[in-house]
Amino acid sequence: MSENEGWCTIESDPGVFTELITKIGVKDIQVEELYTLDSSEYDRLKPVLGLIFLFKWEKEEENRTISDNENIFFANQVIQNACATQAILSVLLNSEGIELGEELSNFKSFVGDFPPMMKGEAIGNSELIKETHNSFTVQDPFIFSKKKNRKPSDAFHFISFIPFQGKVYELDGLKKGPYCLGDCTPDNWLEIATPFIQKRMEKYSQGEIRFNLMAVIKNRQTTLQEKILTLEKKKNDLEIKLSELNSGSGGDNKEESGGATPTTKEDLNFMINVVNNDIEEANNEILMEQEKFRNWKDENIRRKHNFTPLILNLIKGLAEKDNLQPLIQKAKDQISQKQQQHK
């Protein structure tokens, strides 16, 4: 694997990943962190395009067979710090029915016939991808020299799980190719992937709790708006049927429709109320999504901002007014008191 060559590390956070995807040019896609592997959580977020798993990397022997599917986009990891962005790309570039944007679409076409190592090199050389990735750099005024005897930090790694052409794949840029986990349908692929993810979680949880799982999904606001349109149509159909019954032009017999839809006034009014509640719930969810996106935006601004000059100026101002030393002494006294309490 090459050195990082100007690639920063980025935080494993759904707000960061969502903004990164948008800045690359992909439309109506977001990332959500998963706290459980329950099917109810999957159902809430569907459609799920792929899963991204972060864990502390340790070298391991691999005896699984590499898939020979040449249609799948698979790139070897060449730049260490690019692994998060590469895991995201592994999902996006293997997904159908999403708008990649002109530049990423051209990139996908350009590298389509490249071998995995060259695909990885192409990712590292893409100005669009690199600049977008590095837009999340946290400015640091301090430069630390790399000492030879300095203990290396833990290496964390991202892998992806995706459905592709009727099968579930695990994509790990440190491996020679994709691993096929089994056959699937668009509706059950998460059920196929879950046991493999659980196995990894159980393995790492024995001595390592620092891992997380995120889902790449269609934009929730767009999905909810589509749901509301469907509910509005259903409500309109029910109201038309109710109007027909009230005017006497419609039958009041369930047998006429084979019991497929409510045909009594009571049942129709009940169903209209149910649909109204569903619409209200969806609208409330949209408001929560909008609030979440505002929070993500604010958090990302704070992540990128260097607060060190502000802190230094505050300290300087306290020192000029002779208020710094009393605060330092107060802090020392508090630490001393806590140490005495623990003895």
Swiss-Prot record:
Which residues carry the site feature described as Transition state stabilizer?
Q77
Q: Which gene encodes it?
A: uch2
Q: Which organism is it from?
A: Dictyostelium discoideum (Social amoeba)
Per the record, where is site Important for enzyme activity? D172
- Tell me, in a sentence or two, what this protein's role is: Protease that specifically cleaves 'Lys-48'-linked polyubiquitin chains. Deubiquitinating enzyme associated with the 19S regulatory subunit of the 26S proteasome.
Question: Which portions of the sequence form the region Disordered?
Answer: 242-266
Q: What is its EC number?
A: 3.4.19.12
Q: Which family does it belong to?
A: Belongs to the peptidase C12 family.
Pfam family example for this protein? Peptidase_C12
Q: What class of enzyme is it?
A: hydrolase
Kindly list the places in or outside the cell where this protein is found, as annotated in its UniProt entry: Cytoplasm; Nucleus
By what name is this protein known? Answer: Ubiquitin carboxyl-terminal hydrolase isozyme L5
| Reaction equations catalysed | Thiol-dependent hydrolysis of ester, thioester, amide, peptide and isopeptide bonds formed by the C-terminal Gly of ubiquitin (a 76-residue protein attached to proteins as an intracellular targeting signal)
Q: From its record, what is one biological process in GO terms?
A: protein deubiquitination
Subunit structure of this chain's protein: Component of the 19S (PA700) regulatory complex of the 26S proteasome.
Q: Which InterPro entries match?
A: Papain-like_cys_pep_sf, Peptidase_C12_UCH, Peptidase_C12_UCH_sf, Ubiquitinyl_hydrolase_UCH37, UCH_C
Listed GO molecular functions? Answer: cysteine-type deubiquitinase activity
